[in-house]
Amino acid sequence: MTVIRKKHPLIKMINHSFIDLPAPSNISSWWNFGSLLGLCLIIQILTGLFLAMHYTSDTATAFSSVAHICRDVNYGWLIRYMHANGASMFFICLFLHVGRGIYYGSYNMIETWNMGIILLFAVMATAFMGYVLPWGQMSFWGATVITNLLSAIPYIGTTLVEWIWGGFSVDKATLTRFFAFHFILPFIITALVLVHLLFLHETGSNNPTGLNSDTDKIPFHPYYTIKDFLGVLILLMVFMILALFFPDILGDPDNYTPANPLNTPPHIKPEWYFLFAYAILRSIPNKLGGVLALILSILILALMPILHTSKQRALTFRPITQTMYWILVADLFILTWIGGQPVEYPFIIIGQTASIAYFTIIMILMPITSVIENNILNLD
């Protein structure tokens, strides 16, 4: 077995990536989320494949085909709810994974980090298009509002929107192409994940101290395969509780009403995992400004390596910047809450304050506190 593992061209690659991979001896449970994201991706592809067998991407039958899956297909209700809540679990793991990267300074592995940002955009695009497919009220109006934002682009905006729609409004052509893209993107994401891992294995993993761990490595298997398996069990338990007992808790009741272009819902909002970005978008009264802020709210992650002014890599031994980090986390929770509220006083002003705080903490306060800590420790 050892001979095959180390000499077979294909198995050798798997061996170097998941079995004999040298890993730091001190990485904590925060390093579990990479493997959990891989599991989420597999679950989403498999459940999505079975849903696609019964789904029809036509405005006349899309809503009823989803109802048919839940009522008439064997375990169709389970597959549908696993897919819907699997997206939520995917984003929970994604946010924790990115949060870990920021806390421990993993963004200094620039290629891996930038590949991760591309992956984040790809997953967000996939999730958005998937939300449109059931063709409920929130699907239709969410698609209309979000795609319409592209009309803010000077000169080509309106043409671009109509090109994406395939007509003068969100209709059959839009639904068909969204289904096509939603089907193909997870496979593109899988390819990008392999590139992400390729870059990661070029440098090796970071660790909680932020120090070089070349002198203290252990094999990935059995140590971290067992550790990851515990994470998998916890994730599956939470996931199945969510999908079996509270399947609709993260969804929108409006999406159980078939799409009606003549009846606008009182409050249009995306899924919970986009609410922080949606709140930032809405906090700027200008359309183009809002769109730029929306894109920048994710793209700002690419500036992290440039904004790193500390002589230490991780936040482990930096209490002042740690405080800033946890204020940023609290701010993201506030933005998520605001994104789900109607556009009225006092939510408007809270959203604007939280949006300013978000960019200020990342671009100004964290670099400043890092310099202060350098001076306190005489590391300048």
Swiss-Prot record:
It comes from the Eukaryota. One of its GO terms (molecular function) is ubiquinol-cytochrome-c reductase activity. A ubiquinone binds at residue 201. PROSITE patterns: CYTB_CTER (PS51003), CYTB_NTER (PS51002). Heme b b562 binds at residues 83, 182. Heme b b566 binds at residues 97, 196. The chain crosses the membrane at residues 33-53, 77-98, 113-133, 178-198, 226-246, 288-308, 320-340, 347-367. One of its GO terms (cellular component) is mitochondrial inner membrane. Keywords: Electron transport, Heme, Iron, Membrane, Metal-binding, Mitochondrion, Mitochondrion inner membrane, Respiratory chain, Transmembrane, Transmembrane helix, Transport, Ubiquinone. It is a multi-pass membrane protein. Binds 2 heme b groups non-covalently. Its cofactor is heme b. One of its GO terms (biological process) is mitochondrial electron transport, ubiquinol to cytochrome c. SUPFAM superfamilies: a domain/subunit of cytochrome bc1 complex (Ubiquinol-cytochrome c reductase), Transmembrane di-heme cytochromes. The keyword Iron-sulfur does not apply. It is found in: Mitochondrion inner membrane. Heme 1 (or BL or b562) is low-potential and absorbs at about 562 nm, and heme 2 (or BH or b566) is high-potential and absorbs at about 566 nm. The cytochrome bc1 complex contains 11 subunits: 3 respiratory subunits (MT-CYB, CYC1 and UQCRFS1), 2 core proteins (UQCRC1 and UQCRC2) and 6 low-molecular weight proteins (UQCRH/QCR6, UQCRB/QCR7, UQCRQ/QCR8, UQCR10/QCR9, UQCR11/QCR10 and a cleavage product of UQCRFS1). This cytochrome bc1 complex then forms a dimer. Belongs to the cytochrome b family. Component of the ubiquinol-cytochrome c reductase complex (complex III or cytochrome b-c1 complex) that is part of the mitochondrial respiratory chain. The b-c1 complex mediates electron transfer from ubiquinol to cytochrome c. Contributes to the generation of a proton gradient across the mitochondrial membrane that is then used for ATP synthesis. This is Cytochrome b. It comes from Alexandromys middendorffii (Middendorf's vole). The gene is MT-CYB.
